[in-house]
Amino acid sequence: REEGGDKVVVHKVDLTSATSTKAKDAVWIKLIKSALMENRLHLVHQPIASLQSQENDMYDVVVRMKDPRGNEILPGDFLPAAQRNGLMKTLDRWIINAAVQFCASRRASRVFVRISSDSIADHGLAKWVSQLVKNAKLPTSVICFQVPEDVAAENMLPTQELAQQLGEFGFSFAIEHFGISTNAGRLLEQLTMDYIKIDGSLMQGLASNELKQTKVRSLVEMARARDVQTIAERVK
C-alpha cells in the first residue's frame, strides 16, 4: 500500500497461496484478461522535457491496472506475468490506442509509448498504428515509440527494422534507460532513433559526481553528433 500526494492507494495482490511461478501467473493472467474486458486499465501521463528541444506538452505514458475492487496495481507487478504468457502484444496495442485517444483529447505535442520485445517482432504494428492515428485525425509525429536499451541490444535487427518502418510512417523512435550498458555507442551507430532517454541512475547525484558528469556529457555529445535529442529520466 502506497499513498502519494493525491492519496492514490496502490494495491498488492495477495499471491501467498500460489507457490510456483506458474500458479502465480495463472492468477495474474485472469486479472489481466478481466481488466482488458472490463476496462480496468488506465494510463498515467508523466510530463517530460527534452534537454535540447523546445517542445512542450510531451508525456511519458505508463499503464496501471485496477482489480475488481478498484485497488490500483502497478505495472511492475503484472507486466512480468504478461511477458511470460504472451499477453504483451495485446497490452501494447491497448496502451497505444489509449495514448492516441489522450493525444486527441489533450492535443499533446508528443507522447512516449514503450513497447515490448513481442511488439518489436510484430510486423503489422507500424501499419496498424498509422491507421489508428489517421482515424483520430492526428499527425503521426504525436507518437514516439520507445524501447529499453537492453531490449534493443538483445533484438538489434528487429528493432532496427521496426524503427525504420515507424520512421517511414512519420513516427519517432527512442531508446530509454540509455547509457547503463556498454552497448550505448553501438546502438547509436546502428539504430535509427530520434531520442535517447538517459537512465535515471546516471542523473541521480549528477551535480556532485564528476564521473557521472563525464559520462552524461559523453552520451549527450554522441547523440548530438547524430542529430539525436536527449531526455533525462527521473529529473523533476
What does each model-identified segment do?
Residues G76-P80, K89, Q164:
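Conserved long alpha-helical elements within nucleotide-processing catalytic cores of c-di-GMP signaling
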Residues D14-A81, R114, Q146, I175, ...:
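Active-site core of bacterial EAL-family cyclic-dinucleotide phosphodiesterase domains
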Residues E55-D60, L87-P158, R234:
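Catalytic core of bacterial c-di-GMP phosphodiesterases, primarily the EAL and HD-GYP domains
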Residues S20, K24-V27, M37, Q83, ...:
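Signal-transducing alpha-helical linker
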Residues D6-K7, D25, E38-V44, K89, ...:
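PAS/PAS-like sensory domains
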Residues R1-G4, V9-V27, L31, D77, ...:
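Cyclic nucleotide signaling catalytic output domains
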Residues L132-L206, S218-K236:
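The catalytic core of metal-dependent phosphodiesterases that act on cyclic dinucleotides
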